């Protein structure tokens, strides 16, 4: 019966639904004409703001402050997330620049620029019996740092010629209205709605997933109706898939080696490697909508994020259970 439970695990169901949304985008694509009945794009915009509002409401400031003393672990995780990842991809910038594969490289760099995922990092660390408090701290703080770092890192390589001052101002406005303002509002309302959020945390988590599924559906609908995938050859898909898997293993083992050099204990090593090697599908999906990425390229940016997210869930789930068994 355990194999049945694994198949119907919440994360596996979500991955299955992601695939379903891609299929729906092909078979029943959402078209602009449907906006007169239901404006999906506006609903997603409000949903993005809602996710970050809830993120602010769920953030436990006391937990964050209490665990700040474990600074070596926190620094290593954030350096892995926002320095090591982008640096590894940047090594291939010279190869991709000026070629038809530059957008492919940029989509992988976008993945590398994202913050760590929140929920699955904490869950996997818990399964492997790592330092859960530090996992919560890093998962939370990574999302906040990502609000600044992801747009900053991407700004160095996104086309400047096609974006005038007005479009740059619009990107900043979108980030402020859809990301920063909701988080600040959530933090201010945290003391009032803390108990409510804790009580209904399971249902609140489902809201995140619904918005992500809708973003995937809308993006792939546009991609299929505008024939975007004609530009994604099997060779490009293989490059993206291999790059995602290689990135994970390189970062994971570099962080594990550094943990050994710093004499981290078992629990801190688990937390560092698990949190530092993860990338957030939530933030990836949301940043695609607010960074001024052209409509016809959104799917190309989303593809590496979805591949990496799927791989990290399946592999790290297996790895966490193996580490837990070895500890007993």
Predicted regions and their residues:
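Membrane-helix cytosolic exit motif
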Residues: 250-259, 302-328
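Structural signature of multi-pass alpha-helical membrane transport proteins
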Residues: 1-97, 155, 159-266, 327-328
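Membrane-embedded alpha-helical segments of transport systems
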Residues: 80-88, 113-118, 135-156, 176-180, ...
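Membrane-interface helix-loop-helix junctions at boundaries between adjacent transmembrane segments
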Residues: 93-149, 154, 158-171
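Helix-loop junctions at the membrane interface of multi-pass solute transporters
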Residues: 66-67, 119-131, 231, 256-260, ...
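Extracellular/periplasmic helix-loop-helix junctions in multi-pass membrane proteins
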Residues: 227-234, 288-306
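The feature identifies polytopic integral membrane transport proteins across all domains of life
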Residues: 71-78, 99-112, 130-140, 262-277, ...
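Hydrophobic alpha-helical transmembrane segments of integral membrane proteins
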Residues: 92-99, 286-292
């Amino acid at each position: 019966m355990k194999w049945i439970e694994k198949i119907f695990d919440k994360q596996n169901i979500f991955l299955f639904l992601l695939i379903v949304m891609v299929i729906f985008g092909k078979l029943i694509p959402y078209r602009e004409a449907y906006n007169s009945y239901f404006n999906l794009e506006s609903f997603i915009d409000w949903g993005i703001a809602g996710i970050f509002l809830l993120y602010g409401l769920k953030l436990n400031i006391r937990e964050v402050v209490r665990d700040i003393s474990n600074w070596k672990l926190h620094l290593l995780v954030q350096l892995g997330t926002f320095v090591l990842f982008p640096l590894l991809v940047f090594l291939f910038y010279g190869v991709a620049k000026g070629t038809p594969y530059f957008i492919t490289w940029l989509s992988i760099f976008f993945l590398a620029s994202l913050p760590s995922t929140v929920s699955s990092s904490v869950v996997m660390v818990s399964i492997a019996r790592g330092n859960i408090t530090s996992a919560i701290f890093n998962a939370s703080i990574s999302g906040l740092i990502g609000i600044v770092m992801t747009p900053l890192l991407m700004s160095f390589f996104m086309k400047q010629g096609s974006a005038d001052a007005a479009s740059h101002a619009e990107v900043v406005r979108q980030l402020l209205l859809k990301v920063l303002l909701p988080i600040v509002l959530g933090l201010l309302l945290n003391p009032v709605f803390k108990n409510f959020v804790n009580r209904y945390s399971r249902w609140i988590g489902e809201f995140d997933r619904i918005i992500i599924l809708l973003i995937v559906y809308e993006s792939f609908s546009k991609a299929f109706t505008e024939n975007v995938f004609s530009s994604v050859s099997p060779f490009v898909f293989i490059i993206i898939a291999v790059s995602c898997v290689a990135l994970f293993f390189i970062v994971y083992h570099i962080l594990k080696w550094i943990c050994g050099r710093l004499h981290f204990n078992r629990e801190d090593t688990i937390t560092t490697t698990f949190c530092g090697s993860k990338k957030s599908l939530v933030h990836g999906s949301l940043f695609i909508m607010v960074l001024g990425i052209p409509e016809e390229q959104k799917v190309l940016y989303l593809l590496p994020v979805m591949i990496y997210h799927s791989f990290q869930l399946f592999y790290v789930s297996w790895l966490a259970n193996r580490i837990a068994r070895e500890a007993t």
